[in-house]
Amino acid sequence: MLDICLLGCGGSLPTSDRNLTSLLISYNGRKILIDCGEGTQVSMKEIAWGFKDIDVICFTHYHADHVMGLTGLLLTIANSGRIDPLTIIGPEGLREVVKGLTVVAPFFPYEIELIELDSKCSDNFLDKVFKIEDVEIFALPVDHSIECLSYSVRVNRKRKFDVNKAKANEVPLKIWNELQRGKEITYENKLYVPDMVLGESRKGIKITYCTDTRPVDSLHKFAYKSDLFVCEGMYGEEEKKEKAVDKKHMIFSEAAGIAKAAEVKELWLTHFSPALSEPEKYLENAKEIFENTHIGSDRKIKIINFENN
């Protein structure tokens, strides 16, 4: 089971009912935060998921509406009692940005580990950038006015132990547990590997987050078969497409086009322009292309369960 909360859905500037952009993913006691705009920790306090277990913060890019909540959040994490290292991932320039944002708070009771990614826009996938237990984070360069990344968070599901397979392979009972945990074991001068006792691969969970970009073809494959695709819809109106092209953003129908091409299960629109006071008025522009589209809102929550297999 994986929990997702859209902490903030505003773009550019906060409004009376929208914090700036941020997405929180929680799985098995671990939390991943993508972007940290103003108001992030306010929403976190309201949903009461806790701060101490935030292990990774991923930045898409370094425009102010995506990073200005970091300083306060790091201080709150410190006050929560965290002492384990915290990892921050982002495009090139991460060290300079974090250094600037923490001038007023230079000391924390935990180490901050920084991972800077090559984020020149291209059609090539970046390799897996981070792994924590069963959760893997991937990144893809997209097309904004500055270097920007899209992120995909994938939860791998453990394969079931297959007793019949273990017996057929004549695996000694006393090493079953270690093989089930993924270890290779040499026993009585013979090598035993996990594949000798484990069943078929099982479908995991995939969440893809994309904001501040024009549509790029590589997103179709990157977001392919996502259980949830959280994508920017800066403007709802079709007539705003020219502005979206100029500002390197998307309109609702373009986000829906990516969702359809990627065959995702569900699309949440987010990162709305402050001028877009009623995004639901333009929802049909997206639903005509991809039916299972929803308007994002601050503190919108979804629980995704593994399929029964």
Swiss-Prot record:
Coiled coil feature spans: none
Cofactor: Zn(2+)
Domain of life: Bacteria
GO MF annotations, alphabetized: 3'-tRNA processing endoribonuclease activity; zinc ion binding
Gene3D superfamilies named among the record's database cross-references: Ribonuclease Z/Hydroxyacylglutathione hydrolase-like
Binding-site residues, Zn(2+) 2: D65, H66, D212, H271
Residues binding Zn(2+) 1, per UniProt: H61, H63, H144, D212
Catalysed conversion reaction: Endonucleolytic cleavage of RNA, removing extra 3' nucleotides from tRNA precursor, generating 3' termini of tRNAs. A 3'-hydroxy group is left at the tRNA terminus and a 5'-phosphoryl group is left at the trailer molecule
CC cofactor note: Binds 2 Zn(2+) ions.
Free-text function comment from the UniProt entry: Zinc phosphodiesterase, which displays some tRNA 3'-processing endonuclease activity. Probably involved in tRNA maturation, by removing a 3'-trailer from precursor tRNA.
Official protein name in the record: Ribonuclease Z
Classification lineage: Bacteria, Bacillati, Bacillota, Clostridia, Eubacteriales
